[in-house]
A protein has these predicted regions:
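Surface-exposed, low-hydrophobicity beta-strand/loop segments enriched in small/polar/acidic residues
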Residues: 1-138
Length: 138
């Protein structure tokens, strides 16, 4: 990076302690939470959470875990709740936190950060593309 003011920064995978048990939570969306002044990873707990990280290596509470934050110039895979088609807007699932789903008409206003790049079924790691976060009314 050419900007000398950008010291101690990095791109790509980051490692943080788990604030909850993240064992088996790979390919789910994670968020950063404050744990007594220390950044930790956790699963989202609300459909309006900002959870831009895809879990790469989960572990028990307090152990180091790793996650990636895909940029808008790359695609990624996230566990899907329900079904989707290419081009569907994807929001955080309210029943399986960390997964995404394609909300149906009438679902209300939800935060959307990804679109589907392929058709998918429940439990699949569906190919997605990150988009600028926005509230969408379904």
């Amino acid at each position: 990076m050419l900007n000398p003011g950008q010291t101690n920064t990095r791109k790509g995978e980051i490692n943080l302690p788990a604030s909850v048990n993240l064992t088996g939570c790979e390919n789910l969306l994670w968020k950063i939470v404050n744990n007594n002044g220390v950044a930790n990873f956790a699963l989202p707990t609300s459909v309006n959470d900002i959870a831009p990280f895809i879990g790469a290596s989960g572990d028990v509470i307090g152990a180091n875990t790793s996650a990636e934050a895909p940029s808008m110039n790359e695609n990624a895979r996230i566990l899907l709740d329900g079904t989707c088609n290419p081009g569907d807007k994807l929001a955080l699932s309210s029943t399986n936190y960390g997964r995404v789903y394609a909300p149906a008409s009438g679902a209300g206003s939800l935060l959307v950060e990804f679109i589907a790049e392929e058709a998918g079924v429940a439990g699949q790691t569906v190919l997605v593309r990150r988009i600028p976060a926005r509230l969408v009314t379904f």
